[in-house]
Protein backbone atom coordinates (compact mmCIF):
# COMPACT_ATOMS: atom_id res chain seq x y z
CA UNK A 1 0.00 0.00 0.00
CA UNK A 2 1.20 3.50 -0.79
CA UNK A 3 -0.11 6.94 0.06
CA UNK A 4 -1.64 8.98 -2.74
CA UNK A 5 1.05 11.68 -2.41
CA UNK A 6 3.71 9.05 -3.26
CA UNK A 7 2.35 8.51 -6.79
CA UNK A 8 4.86 9.48 -9.48
CA UNK A 9 5.04 8.97 -13.26
CA UNK A 10 5.39 5.26 -13.96
CA UNK A 11 3.84 4.11 -10.67
CA UNK A 12 1.56 1.11 -11.18
CA UNK A 13 -1.55 0.86 -8.98
CA UNK A 14 -4.58 -1.42 -8.77
CA UNK A 15 -7.82 0.55 -8.74
CA UNK A 16 -11.33 -0.95 -8.96
CA UNK A 17 -9.78 -4.31 -9.91
CA UNK A 18 -7.84 -2.87 -12.87
CA UNK A 19 -4.16 -2.06 -13.30
CA UNK A 20 -3.19 1.54 -14.11
CA UNK A 21 0.09 3.31 -14.77
CA UNK A 22 0.44 6.94 -13.71
CA UNK A 23 1.07 9.07 -16.80
CA UNK A 24 0.88 12.48 -15.13
CA UNK A 25 0.27 13.86 -11.64
CA UNK A 26 -0.19 17.23 -9.96
CA UNK A 27 -0.50 18.32 -6.32
CA UNK A 28 -3.40 20.79 -6.11
CA UNK A 29 -3.92 23.06 -3.11
CA UNK A 30 -7.26 24.82 -3.48
CA UNK A 31 -7.93 28.05 -1.62
CA UNK A 32 -10.25 26.20 0.74
CA UNK A 33 -10.13 22.59 1.77
CA UNK A 34 -7.56 19.84 1.69
CA UNK A 35 -4.76 19.28 -0.79
CA UNK A 36 -5.61 16.75 -3.49
CA UNK A 37 -3.56 14.72 -5.93
CA UNK A 38 -4.83 14.99 -9.52
CA UNK A 39 -3.61 12.12 -11.71
CA UNK A 40 -3.90 10.86 -15.26
CA UNK A 41 -3.91 7.06 -15.26
CA UNK A 42 -3.48 4.72 -18.23
CA UNK A 43 -5.33 1.40 -18.22
CA UNK A 44 -2.69 -1.30 -18.72
CA UNK A 45 -5.02 -3.73 -20.53
CA UNK A 46 -7.20 -1.48 -22.68
CA UNK A 47 -4.84 1.48 -23.10
CA UNK A 48 -7.43 4.16 -22.31
CA UNK A 49 -6.71 7.05 -19.96
CA UNK A 50 -8.75 8.34 -17.04
CA UNK A 51 -8.46 11.40 -14.78
CA UNK A 52 -8.65 10.57 -11.08
CA UNK A 53 -8.37 12.70 -7.93
CA UNK A 54 -7.16 11.41 -4.59
CA UNK A 55 -7.14 13.05 -1.17
CA UNK A 56 -3.68 13.36 0.35
CA UNK A 57 -3.04 10.41 2.65
CA UNK A 58 -5.48 8.12 0.83
CA UNK A 59 -4.15 4.54 0.74
CA UNK A 60 -3.75 2.88 -2.67
CA UNK A 61 -2.71 -0.64 -3.66
CA UNK A 62 0.57 -0.45 -5.52
CA UNK A 63 1.71 -3.17 -7.90
CA UNK A 64 5.38 -4.02 -8.11
CA UNK A 65 6.41 -4.32 -11.75
CA UNK A 66 9.63 -5.44 -13.37
CA UNK A 67 11.08 -4.24 -16.67
CA UNK A 68 13.31 -6.68 -18.49
CA UNK A 69 14.95 -6.46 -21.93
CA UNK A 70 13.59 -8.93 -24.46
CA UNK A 71 14.52 -9.41 -28.11
CA UNK A 72 11.78 -9.70 -30.73
CA UNK A 73 12.33 -12.96 -32.62
CA UNK A 74 9.29 -13.65 -34.83
CA UNK A 75 5.55 -13.22 -35.26
CA UNK A 76 2.82 -15.84 -35.50
CA UNK A 77 -0.43 -14.19 -36.57
CA UNK A 78 -1.45 -11.75 -33.81
CA UNK A 79 1.13 -13.15 -31.39
CA UNK A 80 4.69 -11.89 -31.11
CA UNK A 81 7.53 -14.03 -29.74
CA UNK A 82 10.25 -12.47 -27.59
CA UNK A 83 13.40 -13.95 -26.05
CA UNK A 84 14.63 -12.93 -22.61
CA UNK A 85 18.13 -11.45 -22.96
CA UNK A 86 19.33 -13.03 -19.69
CA UNK A 87 17.62 -16.44 -19.42
CA UNK A 88 16.81 -17.03 -23.13
CA UNK A 89 13.21 -17.94 -22.23
CA UNK A 90 10.56 -17.45 -24.92
CA UNK A 91 7.55 -15.23 -24.14
CA UNK A 92 4.48 -14.77 -26.35
CA UNK A 93 2.78 -11.36 -26.24
CA UNK A 94 -0.45 -10.38 -27.98
CA UNK A 95 -0.12 -7.61 -30.60
CA UNK A 96 -2.41 -5.15 -28.76
CA UNK A 97 -0.17 -5.26 -25.65
CA UNK A 98 2.87 -3.89 -27.52
CA UNK A 99 3.30 -0.10 -27.65
CA UNK A 100 4.70 1.00 -31.05
CA UNK A 101 4.30 -2.45 -32.64
CA UNK A 102 4.11 -1.01 -36.19
CA UNK A 103 7.74 0.12 -35.97
CA UNK A 104 9.20 -3.11 -34.59
CA UNK A 105 11.59 -5.12 -36.73
CA UNK A 106 13.13 -8.52 -36.10
CA UNK A 107 15.90 -8.41 -33.51
CA UNK A 108 14.56 -5.23 -31.85
CA UNK A 109 15.14 -4.97 -28.09
CA UNK A 110 12.01 -3.99 -26.12
CA UNK A 111 11.21 -3.61 -22.42
CA UNK A 112 8.69 -6.22 -21.28
CA UNK A 113 6.82 -5.08 -18.17
CA UNK A 114 5.45 -7.81 -15.93
CA UNK A 115 3.68 -8.01 -12.58
CA UNK A 116 6.41 -9.09 -10.14
CA UNK A 117 4.04 -10.97 -7.81
CA UNK A 118 2.26 -13.09 -10.46
CA UNK A 119 4.94 -12.93 -13.20
CA UNK A 120 2.27 -12.16 -15.81
CA UNK A 121 3.20 -9.94 -18.75
CA UNK A 122 1.38 -6.60 -18.68
CA UNK A 123 2.72 -5.00 -21.87
CA UNK A 124 5.85 -4.38 -23.95
CA UNK A 125 7.39 -0.96 -24.55
CA UNK A 126 9.36 -0.10 -27.68
CA UNK A 127 12.22 2.40 -27.42
CA UNK A 128 10.89 5.96 -27.77
CA UNK A 129 12.79 6.53 -31.02
CA UNK A 130 13.76 4.02 -33.71
CA UNK A 131 15.73 4.31 -36.95
CA UNK A 132 14.10 2.78 -40.02
CA UNK A 133 14.84 2.79 -43.74
CA UNK A 134 12.32 4.34 -46.15
CA UNK A 135 11.27 1.65 -48.66
CA UNK A 136 8.81 3.72 -50.69
CA UNK A 137 7.93 7.37 -51.10
CA UNK A 138 7.36 9.76 -53.97
CA UNK A 139 10.67 11.27 -55.11
CA UNK A 140 11.69 14.60 -53.62
CA UNK A 141 12.36 17.62 -55.77
CA UNK A 142 15.42 19.80 -55.27
CA UNK A 143 14.52 22.85 -53.18
CA UNK A 144 11.71 21.12 -51.24
CA UNK A 145 13.16 22.10 -47.87
CA UNK A 146 11.52 25.48 -47.34
CA UNK A 147 8.01 24.37 -46.34
CA UNK A 148 6.58 22.13 -43.63
CA UNK A 149 4.57 20.06 -46.10
CA UNK A 150 4.54 16.33 -45.42
CA UNK A 151 4.11 13.33 -47.72
CA UNK A 152 3.43 9.64 -46.97
CA UNK A 153 6.35 7.21 -46.82
CA UNK A 154 6.50 3.47 -46.15
CA UNK A 155 9.30 2.23 -43.89
CA UNK A 156 10.93 -1.23 -43.77
CA UNK A 157 8.41 -2.58 -41.24
CA UNK A 158 5.50 -1.74 -43.57
CA UNK A 159 4.23 1.16 -41.44
CA UNK A 160 3.30 4.43 -43.12
CA UNK A 161 4.78 7.68 -41.77
CA UNK A 162 4.36 11.32 -42.80
CA UNK A 163 7.77 12.76 -43.79
CA UNK A 164 9.04 16.07 -45.23
CA UNK A 165 9.18 16.43 -49.02
CA UNK A 166 13.00 16.15 -49.20
CA UNK A 167 13.08 12.54 -47.88
CA UNK A 168 13.79 9.94 -50.59
CA UNK A 169 13.69 6.14 -50.86
CA UNK A 170 16.61 4.38 -49.21
CA UNK A 171 17.21 7.08 -46.59
CA UNK A 172 17.21 6.20 -42.89
CA UNK A 173 14.88 8.28 -40.72
CA UNK A 174 14.22 8.49 -36.99
CA UNK A 175 10.62 7.93 -35.85
CA UNK A 176 8.91 8.57 -32.51
CA UNK A 177 7.19 5.26 -31.65
CA UNK A 178 4.63 6.78 -29.26
CA UNK A 179 2.84 8.85 -31.91
CA UNK A 180 4.42 7.65 -35.19
CA UNK A 181 5.83 11.07 -36.07
CA UNK A 182 8.95 11.84 -38.08
CA UNK A 183 11.83 13.08 -35.89
CA UNK A 184 14.71 13.53 -38.30
CA UNK A 185 16.92 12.16 -41.05
CA UNK A 186 19.94 10.05 -40.12
CA UNK A 187 23.05 10.90 -42.10
CA UNK A 188 25.64 8.18 -42.52
UniProtKB/Swiss-Prot annotation:
Keyword Protein biosynthesis attached: yes
Top-rank taxon: Bacteria
Molecular-function GO terms, alphabetical: translation elongation factor activity
Pathway membership: Protein biosynthesis; polypeptide chain elongation
Keyword tags: Cytoplasm, Elongation factor, Protein biosynthesis
Annotated GO CC locations: cytoplasm
GO biological process: peptide biosynthetic process
Alphabetical list of SMART domains matching this protein: EFP (SM01185), Elong-fact-P_C (SM00841)
Gene3D superfamilies cross-referenced by the UniProt entry: 2.30.30.30, Nucleic acid-binding proteins
Pfam hit, one: EFP_N
Main location: cytoplasm
Annotated compartments: Cytoplasm
Alphabetical list of HAMAP family matching this protein: EF_P
Function summary: Involved in peptide bond synthesis. Stimulates efficient translation and peptide-bond synthesis on native or reconstituted 70S ribosomes in vitro. Probably functions indirectly by altering the affinity of the ribosome for aminoacyl-tRNA, thus increasing their reactivity as acceptors for peptidyl transferase.
Family: Belongs to the elongation factor P family.
NCBIfam families: efp, PRK00529.1
Protein's name in the database: Elongation factor P
Annotated organism of origin: Parabacteroides distasonis (strain ATCC 8503 / DSM 20701 / CIP 104284 / JCM 5825 / NCTC 11152)
Lineage, broadest ranks: Bacteria, Pseudomonadati, Bacteroidota, Bacteroidia, Bacteroidales
Gene that produces this protein: efp
